[in-house]
């Protein structure tokens, strides 16, 4: 049976962040993920998770100056100390909240450096993070993102991510495979998820175009959900989409799985 995790950074945006946990539970979710927990008190997050009987499934490493347009710093030479501080913060929250997956947004390709410098920096940072997370029995994830939504993002495809995993050489580094992003960049969703199932550590869903809930676009999620159910993937499926109206009104797609 598929297990869906509500991405509270995108769902239930009609409510204050801490109120979204209760709304997710009321709508039948048993897991939640969110991008950045760092502005919230750990004890407060533990309380809203426990009081709503929710499992925290995923959060991201700190990603630099988000308001200024940064989308990660792992590939930027000269930011290594900041990156390592972010790894420590992510682990501190994961220990307290109980999640076993942390996603790394690698960042936009920086100007002024050679491709070799950028790649070496990224590999070294990911290797450091993976080794630190391995001590905590936590998976490190890297997420390819389409370059239409985030122009200049450094990691945009599955094969690029697979090559990066090989170069880093840590068994707890896997792909966060976002079906929406990869539909925009590659297509071949079924074949990719089937062929590289052992390299996928987390799945996320949204339809295309407009990144709405399943059933609002071109992706055949009825079919893909069967593919996922029949695969070896047994993790959470993160619902990281933009509701086309309200979150509750757009959840009919989930009725067969509640």
Swiss-Prot record:
Disruption phenotype: Does not affect growth on glycolate or glyoxylate. It is an enzyme of class 5 (isomerase). The active site is at 143 (proton donor/acceptor), 240 (proton donor/acceptor). Optimum pH is 6.8-7.2. One of its GO terms (biological process) is glyoxylate metabolic process. It comes from the Bacteria. Its EC number is 5.3.1.22. One of its GO terms (molecular function) is protein homodimerization activity. Induction: By glyoxylate. Pfam families: AP_endonuc_2 (PF01261). Belongs to the hyi family. This is Hydroxypyruvate isomerase. The gene is hyi.
């Amino acid at each position: 049976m598929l297990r869906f995790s509500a991405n509270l950074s995108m769902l239930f945006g009609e409510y204050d962040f801490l109120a979204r946990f209760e709304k997710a539970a009321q709508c039948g979710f048993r897991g939640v993920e969110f991008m950045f927990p760092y502005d919230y008190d750990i004890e407060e997050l533990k309380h809203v998770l426990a009081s709503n009987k929710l499992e925290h499934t995923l959060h991201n490493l700190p990603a630099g100056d988000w308001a200024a347009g940064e989308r990660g710093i792992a590939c930027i030479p000269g930011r290594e100390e900041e990156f390592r501080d972010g790894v420590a913060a992510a682990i501190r929250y994961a220990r307290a909240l109980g999640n076993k997956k942390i996603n790394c947004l690698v960042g936009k390709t920086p100007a002024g450096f050679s491709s070799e410098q950028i790649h070496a920096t990224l590999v070294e940072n990911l290797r450091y993070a993976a080794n630190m997370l391995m001590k905590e029995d936590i998976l490190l994830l890297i997420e390819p993102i389409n370059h239409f939504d985030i122009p200049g993002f450094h990691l945009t495809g599955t094969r690029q991510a697979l090559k990066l995993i090989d170069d880093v050489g840590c068994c707890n580094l896997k792909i966060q495979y976002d079906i929406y992003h990869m539909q925009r960049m590659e297509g071949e969703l079924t074949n990719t998820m089937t062929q590289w199932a052992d390299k996928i550590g987390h799945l996320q869903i949204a339809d295309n175009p407009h990144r709405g809930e399943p059933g609002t676009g071109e992706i055949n999620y009825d079919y893909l959900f069967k593919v996922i159910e029949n695969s070896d993937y047994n993790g959470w499926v993160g619902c990281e989409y933009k509701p086309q109206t309200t979150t509750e009104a757009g959840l009919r797609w989930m009725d067969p799985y509640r």
